[in-house]
Amino acid sequence: MNEREKLEQAIATAKEIHKRQKYSRIDFYDPYPFQKNFHDTGFENNQRLLMCANRIGKSYCGAAEMAMHLTGLYPDWWQGRKYRKAITAWVGGVSNESTRDICQAELLGPPEDPEAWGTGAIPKDCIVSSERKPGVPNAKSLGLIKHISGSNSTVHFKSYESGVEKWM
C-alpha cells in the first residue's frame, strides 16, 4: 500500500469513527461516579432522584438510561435494572417546548435539525419512527424504538402543563 492509499484509508477510518460517535453516542457514554451510582441504584429502587448543579450531565444521564431501557442495549459496566423485552415509557417536562428542547433532544437529537436525527442517546439505527405532536413545531408525541428482543419499545413525550388527564 502506497502513502496515498494509506492516507485515504486513514481518512475513511476517521470518517467512520466520527459517524459512529455521532449516531451511536450511547456507545461512548462513560459516566462520572455520581452518574454510575445513580444507574446502579436502579437495580433495587423504582424511584430515584438525581439532584445536582447545573450543566453537569443530569439530562444526558437520564437520557442514557432511558435509551438503554428502550433498546435493551446495556454496556458491560451496567449494574442497574435491565429490561429484556420492549417497554413503554413516558418522558416528561414542564412544558411542550421544554420537553422537546431537553428530553426529546437528549434522546433523539436536536429537534430543529433533520440531519441531526439520531444524534441523541438513542442510536440512529434503533429509531424506527416517530409521530409529530400537533401544535408544537418540531416536537414529537412518541417514538418507536427498536429493542434487541425483536419488538419495538415506545416512548411517549408528555408535558406537565397539559394536565393530569394527559398522563392517565
Feature-to-residue mapping (PLM):
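Phosphate/NTP-binding elements of NTP-utilizing enzymes
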Residues: 1-168
